């Protein structure tokens, strides 16, 4: 499997009481993959406005390729209002319509896609969803990052996206909800993971449980790893870091259990700092190289 990864979806500004931070799950995942030495690019869209200009400048600052960072002529750059509780757990108000609601790729038929990472949020709009499905059909390997943000999801929408996928990542609350849609009465994380993986045909199912650790199901085997105790600054982007850490290790052909350990270390690193984006390339502590 080639280690060239395209991460599709939202690039945005997380707006907190203390200021704004660059984010969006696909961008966060791509950033951490690059920091771990994986060749990764973002497919997204910004507005023709000052906030979009700041995003492009940030990409340039971090040497992030802008090959597929498109500009919409009229829709604005995305902003998300973030609220943090006393434990640093984030909740989001996601405004619409924004530039990434209408992502289209010129000459898509000529694009070669090795690993395609996409999320459920960007699929809230028909135009972007159509582009996702076209990319998904072309990809050699697909990664579906489930982020259920009310009111931007439905059973029908998630089912449409979840079939013909190799690797799925979600949290324990999302697992419980989706399992209840298809297998009401089935209880327990491991039972639900196995049932959904068999139903949809997933090869890898990754479930994060916050401070309670994480599970992965691969090749019929389930592995669990405890979380790394840290002082939580906030939880913004922690799940994205986890996915990136796991995928980076998987592309380097580590075992599922080892991938979990590396993912947990990166998620803890991000959770202990404010915001989703922090450089860690070459970190001996994280050992992602």
Indicate where each model-derived feature is located.
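Conserved phosphate-binding/catalytic region of the ribokinase-like
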Residues: 1-3, 182, 186-289
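Hydrophobic pocket-lining residues within nucleotide cofactor-binding pockets
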Residues: 46, 121, 230
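Short, hydrophobic/aliphatic alpha-helical segments
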Residues: 9-14, 224-226
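Residues at secondary-structure transition points
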Residues: 20-24, 50, 76, 152, ...
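A short, flexible beta-alpha/helix-coil linker loop
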Residues: 12-15, 149, 174-176, 230-231
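Ribokinase/PfkB-type carbohydrate-kinase core domain
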Residues: 1-6, 58-60, 66-69, 86-221, ...
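Substrate-binding N-lobe of the ribokinase-like
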Residues: 5-7, 14-80, 84-89, 94-100, ...
């Amino acid at each position: 499997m080639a280690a060239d990864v395209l991460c599709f979806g939202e690039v945005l500004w997380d707006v907190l009481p203390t200021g704004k931070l660059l984010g969006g799950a696909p961008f966060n995942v791509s950033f951490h993959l690059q920091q771990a030495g994986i060749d990764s690019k973002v497919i997204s869209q910004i507005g023709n406005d000052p906030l979009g200009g700041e995003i492009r400048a940030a990409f340039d600052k971090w040497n992030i390729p802008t090959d597929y960072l498109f500009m919409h002529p009229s829709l604005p750059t995305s902003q998300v209002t973030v609220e943090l509780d006393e434990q640093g757990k984030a909740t989001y108000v996601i405004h619409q319509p924004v530039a990434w609601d209408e992502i289209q790729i010129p000459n898509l038929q000529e694009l070669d896609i090795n690993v395609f990472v996409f999320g459920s949020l960007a699929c809230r709009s028909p135009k972007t969803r159509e582009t996702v499905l076209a990319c998904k059909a072309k990809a050699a390997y697909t990664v579906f990052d489930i982020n259920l943000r009310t009111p931007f999801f439905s059973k029908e929408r998630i089912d449409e996206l979840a079939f013909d996928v190799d690797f799925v990542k979600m949290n324990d609350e999302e697992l419980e909800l989706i399992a209840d849609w298809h297998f009401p009465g089935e209880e327990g994380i491991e039972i639900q993971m196995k049932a959904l993986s068999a139903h949809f045909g997933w090869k890898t199912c990754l479930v994060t449980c916050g401070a309670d650790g994480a599970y992965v199901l691969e090749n019929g085997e389930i592995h669990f790893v405890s979380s790394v105790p840290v002082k939580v600054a906030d939880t913004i982007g922690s799940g994205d870091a986890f996915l990136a850490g796991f995928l980076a290790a998987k592309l380097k052909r580590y075992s599922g259990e080892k991938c979990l350990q590396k993912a947990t270390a990166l998620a803890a690193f991000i959770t202990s700092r404010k915001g989703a984006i922090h450089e860690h390339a070459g970190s001996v502590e994280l050992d992602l190289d």
